[in-house]
Amino acid sequence: MIIRVTLPTHLRTLAQVTGTITLDVPEPVTRQAILDSLESAYPMLRGTIRDSTSKERRPFIRFFACGEDLSHQPPESPLPGEVTSGIEPFRIIGAMAGG
């Protein structure tokens, strides 16, 4: 399935892309499948979004779809139909911290 993905600016710069990217993701479309496809298409992103060994989400990285934070859902959970149909993008957000 063709999935739209948005990346934070620093990762778009690293991947040398602008705007939303599209990926061909095998079914079932899950966060894990999207990240596997993303890292395959853009190898320079390996280890930036999730740990390259454990595949755990990196601190300060969040995942959103349809206005909902999916960061704490299991990586193999199916994504909303709006994402799998291409209506809504899967968003990878670089969280902010500080005081």
Regions found by a protein language model. Name each.
Residues 1-98:
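Ubiquitin-like/PB1-type beta-grasp interaction modules and other compact soluble beta-rich domains
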